[in-house]
Amino acid sequence: MRCPFCAMEETKVIDSRLVSDGYQVRRRRECGYCHERFTTFESAEVIVPKIIKNDGSREPFDEDKLRRGIQHALEKRPVSSDDVEKAISRIIYQLRATGERDVKSQDVGRLVMAELKELDKVAYIRFASVYLSFDDINQFTNEIEKLKD
């Protein structure tokens, strides 16, 4: 690997350790020419499937869109940003684990609902009301009753 300071290729790894729950390797490197030290991170490149929309079109998975949707449902709810990030990571992991090139948007919605159900029941109902297109109060009531079981 080239040194970011002098661009020479003579670098050596002086320390390696696992980070991010074992999904990344952090390496400290030293340049053999200028003796500067720098850090690199190595992780496997795993492709997230494309999303098949309701109209049949396909679009790339958008982690920011997922995050915005979850944060919108959790607005003014007592859930830490760390818990939100862990939920997003679990959803992405499950999408990758399918091994499929394409995943239906409904499948992503179900994964989000499952995570929100664990994080915060009010946020779950908020998201479900939009995702499941509630038309009247009875649909809210039915979904709330399911949560009580």
From Swiss-Prot:
One of its GO terms (biological process) is negative regulation of DNA-templated transcription. InterPro entries: ATP-cone_dom, NrdR-like_N, RNR_NrdR-like. Its cofactor is Zn(2+). Pfam families: ATP-cone, Zn_ribbon_NrdR. Signal peptide: none annotated. GO terms for molecular function: ATP binding; DNA binding; zinc ion binding. Keywords: ATP-binding, DNA-binding, Metal-binding, Nucleotide-binding, Repressor, Transcription, Transcription regulation, Zinc, Zinc-finger. Binds 1 zinc ion. A zinc finger (unnamed) spans 3-34. Residues 49-139 form the ATP-cone domain. It comes from the Bacteria. PANTHER family: TRANSCRIPTIONAL REPRESSOR NRDR. Belongs to the NrdR family. Negatively regulates transcription of bacterial ribonucleotide reductase nrd genes and operons by binding to NrdR-boxes. This is Transcriptional repressor NrdR.
